[in-house]
From Swiss-Prot:
Disulfide bond positions: 760-767, 797-833
Record region (Disordered): 42-64
Chain spans, region Cytosolic Ser/Thr-rich junction: 33-68
Gene Ontology cellular component annotations, sorted alphabetically: endoplasmic reticulum-Golgi intermediate compartment; external side of plasma membrane; extracellular exosome
Membrane topology: Single-pass type II membrane protein
Entries under PROSITE patterns matching the protein: ZINC_PROTEASE
Record-listed Sulfotyrosine modification sites: 176, 418, 423
Binding positions (Zn(2+)): 387, 391, 410
Originating gene: Anpep
The name this protein goes by in its record: Aminopeptidase N
Post-translational modification: N- and O-glycosylated. Sulfated.
């Protein structure tokens, strides 16, 4: 599943400069709302009503839970192994006379008894069963022998089970089949089998679609809903004749539905053995464009008819074939299925989902309009497609046995997405962006004492909430970062060889992460050119089983090199023990006297002449930032690097110019170097035209904005930024012929946006005049938006910030009428840039109205308002006042609460705010925080660190900016 909560490069830059906090650090998904019970009931009553009390899903209640009973344990027992399912589903796309959208289903599951048992335990969630002989299921054997009689069936809500108690025992080795008939709500909760809605003109259209990961296949039909319980699935859908149906496999047969001639019944080919969370089926009025890849795979891009007609699926179609072919070569394994459908959904919780053969996306992650979408939108599409297609092998063909190893699925896909996208767009240098997008973003979280290791013991991850909490930036971005490091020190060829062996060995089955280490080690053992200092497992277990990362410190006078667990707050208490005592085995590529060399640090401290320098030479560690660690030097070497940057910055690689800025600011935050040294590392930016160093600087200085935009420090800080960015602004003004053209490369286009955003936010008059004029021209002629798509987020946000009610209302009207999701996203984010508190308060009230803001976008919109210094107190008051209501009514199991907590607390830097946060925790302890629990602890830790940092650095920072802003 792709990272859910996405902010474009442009919007991310705006966030840095206008106080909009960077909220991409944690994987964030949107608020899941309570089911609507009475909407549109007057329009139609064609769907059946839900059954009465005889088949209600009333849970079995007992005074105390007996944990010894298998149905009270969250993990399935090993007694039964599923072989196959036959599932028939009929979604009703109009509400019944209760006002509910529902679906009806029939399911037959075939399973083998692995251990003798007198109880069948299978997952079921929010399903109403039709009783058959006073029971919810019918059981039989395949060999004709009598099956045990059913004593009773019950639904256990806590563990989400349908439990079948038998009067006798199932026989080990014998196969059985169990039938059930059920109904469920086709709710708009973005989980399981759900509905998505969109407008076509004035007509509301409804889509029936799915999102099974992690534990919601059970909400669609009764199933053994764990990733290791692989089986074959035979899916049949019944739907109106004017619609189309899709599933993981190609249709096998379509025919009129005998009971209703207005409907079609389509049976799909049986799937290979696969996990329940990868199932998908969709009924809609969508259209598609298609092609056949070089390897004979049928490719389809599906979306709303208007989006397809306007060519918004063309780019996705053009890159899908090459990316599929790239991964087939990269894995040395053919694509496992006959077709690859990808579909853009109006309402979708995550960024995308890798359902095998039918990948589902948010519209913004799949559709691209060449006239209205930005280069950032285009990059988003190609990287998310690459991420999801990477999963078709790694995750789908071979699947982790349990969610505690989710990092292997998502971390791997988050790494190779850059390789696949780079293959599709070879001129973009996308692989370099991983340093900014993943390595540096996740370090901000992994440097906290409340972080967690990539891999957890399986018995620590049991409940759906615990599973969902794993979908965070550690899993995705740290996973990607350490796999990138592994591939780098092994070499890509060796890495691919081990990977191919792993996939061939475990195809259609399940693994633990140690299986990958074993196959990579085999590849190492078969050659002699690459010989790490220890086995792959010995090296990598220290990166997988320990939280955090080291700071590598070099003394160029003595040649001493050492490592230490890096903590943003050096006073924080690390309560999680490590069997490795927070010592890592770190590969260290370095540059000295213009020559590259390599070193392994596998102890806490060592000494080598390699790290000693003469009076006129410097050393630079972690070339191209392939290692997942920070680097610190003695003061003398820092000064030499600064002198080099200010005399001839081209001698130092672009990525490492960004690294010098990033690492020094983090070291300063941890009080390992003076804050003024880190600030000195930005002086060379007046001569810098490359994107990565500028972006690293702006990301680092964003923390200063959050800490100081309510204090006197902010004035000289803005003046300094204005001084540094002015040459860059006029450089791009000249390069683009006064903003008429765009620079040729991706990185240049991103830095053009940096230049405009920074210049406007720091008060450069020429920039303000530019954005106000562009926005004014659009307001005069709303049907002719001449603002280039790359610049729209920047122009919209700044014009709204500089303007008032008229500018905001115009943007709101354009947002309401936007037909392209990328344009709507730009406007929705820019609407949070207003400086008028009453406007922001009104906008906040709109966020919980799904007629105004889609539910998938609620969290990101609230966070955008909170990240505006004028809107921050409004949102904090709102969250505190409404937490219980939000948590109980809007889905405690969604990812959004972690992001809400993180987004609202980013500015906290005073004792008063810490007290408020502690009181918030105490006041809501009974309600709980669900998947936001860890985020709350991180917020408390970060707030304490912020308080100390501001106290210690405010005067020095104020003095430095004052002295360097003239």
């Amino acid at each position: 599943m792709a990272k859910g909560f996405y902010i474009s490069k442009t919007l991310g830059i705006l966030g840095i400069l206008l106080g909009v906090a960077a909220v991409c650090t944690i994987i964030a998904l949107s608020v899941v709302y309570a089911q609507e019970k009475n909407r549109n009931a007057e329009n139609s009553a064609t769907a059946p009503t839900l059954p009465g009390s005889t088949s209600a899903t009333t849970a079995t209640t007992t005074p105390a839970v007996d944990e010894s009973k298998p149905w009270n344990q969250y993990r399935l027992p090993k007694t039964l192994i599923p072989d196959s399912y036959r599932v028939i589903l009929r979604p009703y796309l109009t509400p019944n006379n209760q006002g509910l959208y529902i679906f009806q289903g029939n399911s037959t599951v075939r399973f083998t008894c692995n251990q003798t048992t007198d109880v069948i335990i299978i997952h079921s969630k929010k399903l109403n069963y039709t009783l058959k002989g006073n029971h919810r299921v019918v059981l039989r054997t395949l060999d004709g022998t009598p099956a045990p009689n059913i004593d009773k069936t019950e639904l256990v809500e806590r563990t989400e089970y349908l439990v079948v108690h038998l009067q006798g025992s199932l026989v080990e080795g014998r196969q059985y089949e169990m039938d059930s008939q059920f109904q469920g709500e086709l709710a708009d909760d973005l989980a399981g089998f759900y509905r998505s809605e969109y407008m076509e003109g004035d007509v509301k259209k409804v889509v029936a679609t799915t999102q099974m990961q992690a534990a919601d296949a059970r909400k669609s039909f009764p199933c053994f809903d764990e990733p290791a319980m692989k089986a074959m699935f035979n899916i049949t859908l019944i739907y109106p004749n004017n619609l189309i149906a899709l599933s993981n496999m190609l249709p096998k047969e379509s025919k009129p539905y005998p009971e209703d001639p207005s409907c079609t019944m389509t049976e799909f080919h049986s799937t290979p053995k696969m996990s329940t969370y990868l199932l998908a089926y969709i009924v809609s009025e969508f259209k598609n464009i298609s092609s056949v890849s070089a390897n004979g795979v049928q490719i389809g891009i599906w979306a709303r008819p208007s989006a397809i007609d306007e060519g918004q699926g063309d780019y996705a179609l053009n890159v899908t074939g090459p990316i599929l072919n790239f991964f087939a070569q990269h894995y040395n394994t053919s694509y496992p299925l006959p077709k690859s459908d990808q579909i853009a959904l109006p309402d979708f919780n995550a960024g995308a989902m890798e359902n095998w053969g039918l990948v589902t996306y948010r519209e913004s992650s799949l559709v691209f309009d060449s006239q209205s979408s930005s280069i950032s939108n285009k990059e988003r599409v190609v990287t998310v497609i690459a991420h999801e297609l990477a999963h078709q092998w790694f995750g789908n063909l071979v699947t982790v046995a349990w969610w505690n190893d989710l990092w292997l699925n998502e971390g791997f896909a988050s790494y190779v997405e850059y390789l696949g996208a780079d293959y599709a767009e070879p001129t973009w240098n996308l692989k370099d962006l991983m340093v900014l997008n993943d390595v540096y973003r996740v370090m901000a979280v992994d440097a906290l004492a409340s972080s967690h290791p990539l891999s957890s013991p399986a018995d620590e991850i049991k409940t759906p909430d615990q599973i969902m909490e794993l979908f965070d930036s550690i899993t995705y971005s740290k996973g990607a970062s350490v796999i990138r490091m592994l591939s780098s020190f092994l070499t890509e060829d060796l890495f691919k060889k081990g990977l191919s062996s792993y996939l061939h060995t475990y195809q259609y089955s399940n693994t633990v992460y140690l299986d990958l280490w074993e196959h990579l080690q085999k590849a190492v053992n078969q050659q002699t050119a690459v010989q790490p200092p220890a086995t792959v497992r010995t090296i990598m277990d220290r990166w997988i089983l320990q939280m955090g990362f080291p700071v590598i410190t070099v003394n160029t006078n003595t040649g001493e090199i050492s490592q230490k667990h890096f903590l943003l707050d050096s006073k924080s208490n690390v309560t999680r023990p490590s069997e490795f005592n927070y010592i890592w085995i770190a590969p260290i590529p370095f540059l000295k006297s213009g020559q590259e060399d390599h070193y392994w640090l596998d102890v806490e401290k060592n000494q080598s002449a390699k790290f000693q320098t003469s009076s006129n030479e410097w050393i630079l560690l972690n070339i191209n930032v392939t290692g997942y660690y920070l680097v610190n030097y003695d003061e003398n070497n820092w000064k030499k690097l600064q002198n080099q940057l200010q005399t001839d910055l081209s001698v130092i690689p672009v990525i490492n110019r960004a690294q010098i800025i990033h690492d020094s600011f983090n070291l300063a935050s941890a009080k390992m170097i003076p804050i003024t040294l880190a600030l000195d590392n930005t002086l060379f930016l007046v001569k810098e035209a490359e994107y990565m160093p500028w972006q690293a600087a702006l990301s680092s200085l964003n923390y200063f904005t959050l800490m100081f935009d309510r204090s006197e420090v902010y004035g000289p800080m803005k003046r300094y930024l204005k001084k540094q960015v002015t040459p860059l602004f006029f450089y791009f003004q000249n390069r683009t012929n006064n903003w008429v053209n765009r620079p040729p490369t991706l990185m240049e286009q991103y830095n053009e946006i940096n230049a405009i955003s920074t210049a406007c936010s720091s008060g450069l008059k020429e920039c303000r005049d530019l954005v106000v004029e562009l926005y004014s021209q659009w307001m005069k002629n709303p049907n002719n938006n001449t603002i280039h798509p790359n610049l729209r987020s920047t122009v919209y946000c700044n014009a709204i910030a500089f303007g008032g009610e008229e500018e905001w209302n115009f943007a709101w009207e354009q947002f309401r009428n936007a037909t392209l999701v990328n344009e709507a996203d730009k406007l929705r984010s820019a609407l949070a840039c207003s400086k008028d508190v009453w406007i922001l308060n009104r906008y906040l009230s709109y966020t919980l109205n799904p007629d105004y803001i889609r539910k998938q976008d609620t969290t990101s919109t609230i966070i955008s308002i909170a990240s505006n210094v004028a809107g921050h107190p409004l949102v904090w008051d709102f969250v505190r006042s409404n937490w219980k209501k939000l948590f109980e009514n809007y889905g405690g199991g969604s990812f959004s609460f972690a992001n809400l907590i993180q987004g609202v607390t980013r500015r906290f830097s005073s004792e008063f705010e810490l007290q408020q946060l502690e009181q918030f925790k105490a006041d809501n302890s009974a309600t709980g925080f669900g998947t936001g629990t860890r985020a709350l602890e991180q917020a408390l830790e970060k707030t304490r660190a912020n308080i100390d940092w501001v106290k210690e650095n405010k005067d020095a920072v104020f003095k430095w900016f004052t002295e360097n802003s003239s």
